[in-house]
UniProtKB/Swiss-Prot annotation:
Substrates-to-products reaction catalysed: isopentenyl diphosphate + 2 oxidized [2Fe-2S]-[ferredoxin] + H2O = (2E)-4-hydroxy-3-methylbut-2-enyl diphosphate + 2 reduced [2Fe-2S]-[ferredoxin] + 2 H(+); dimethylallyl diphosphate + 2 oxidized [2Fe-2S]-[ferredoxin] + H2O = (2E)-4-hydroxy-3-methylbut-2-enyl diphosphate + 2 reduced [2Fe-2S]-[ferredoxin] + 2 H(+)
Binding positions (dimethylallyl diphosphate): 41, 75, 130, 227-229, 271
Positions of (2E)-4-hydroxy-3-methylbut-2-enyl diphosphate binding: 41, 75, 130, 168, 227-229, 271
Family from the record: Belongs to the IspH family.
One Pfam entry name: LYTB
Pathway: Isoprenoid biosynthesis; dimethylallyl diphosphate biosynthesis; dimethylallyl diphosphate from (2E)-4-hydroxy-3-methylbutenyl diphosphate: step 1/1; Isoprenoid biosynthesis; isopentenyl diphosphate biosynthesis via DXP pathway; isopentenyl diphosphate from 1-deoxy-D-xylulose 5-phosphate: step 6/6
Gene that produces this protein: ispH
Name of protein: 4-hydroxy-3-methylbut-2-enyl diphosphate reductase
Reported cofactor(s): [4Fe-4S] cluster
Taxonomic source organism: Phocaeicola vulgatus (strain ATCC 8482 / DSM 1447 / JCM 5826 / CCUG 4940 / NBRC 14291 / NCTC 11154)
Binding site for isopentenyl diphosphate: 41, 75, 130, 227-229, 271
Active site (UniProt): 132
Amino acid sequence: MVNIEIDEGSGFCFGVTTAIRKAEEELAKGNTLYCLGDIVHNGQECERLKKMGLITINHEEFAQLHDAKVLLRAHGEPPETYAIARTNNIEIIDATCPVVLRLQKRIKQEYDNVPASQDTQIVIYGKNGHAEVLGLVGQTHGKAIVIETPAEAAHLDFTKDIRLYSQTTKSLEEFWQIIEYIKEHISPDATFEYYDTICRQVANRMPNIRKFAAAHDLIFFVCGRKSSNGKILYQECKKINPNSYLIDQPEEIDRNLLEDVRSIGICGATSTPKWLMEECKKAILNEK
């Protein structure tokens, strides 16, 4: 008999849970509700909410909208979004994650407090174009420098002061690699300060996912293709257990992989709904 375990630590983080709850509450009232961008980087959950009536729009469509109600997802938005909402009489339901909100305020404060004469580089370790990163860069009027990997730290100007922050869902390990690299290369005349702004709910999943991956013969990591956090966690799974496979939905399960395994683990990202992992378990059991 095959043992199938769903990782208790996987599933929505509190920021995503709050955003979805707010959307469901509003839709339950029968109101028309728009969401600026995918509410979560998971196609199956987005489809579920679409069936409930949630209308997903992009920033161009948002700018053309008037007298409407719009939900801002957990990733956060730049100041320009709020300015458009005021101009267009858009009622905002702000579901920005409190961890992201605090980070936005810190970066804005850093930017506002730097004298014009002081050429300080505000650096964000994150994914270029990611919704959260766009919101963070927006706090600096587009002046912040985004680096995606430790290798990109080499492009910084080490003769100038550096203030380093991180997207909340990035790898803590890589963040420290960047810190060490900058410390080694910064000019004695320049200052370097860094702030560990990675969400602990995300960071703490790394040791848990390692333990979970090691405990099973086969791992199915359930995650939307757009999930930044999911890519990091899946790579860690694969490192610990080479017999790990990334799937977006139950239909992607390769039945050939189920042969001769005694223990199967199902886990996911902070954007993976529990119900989807349960569906994957059901799909496996139907075949076994």
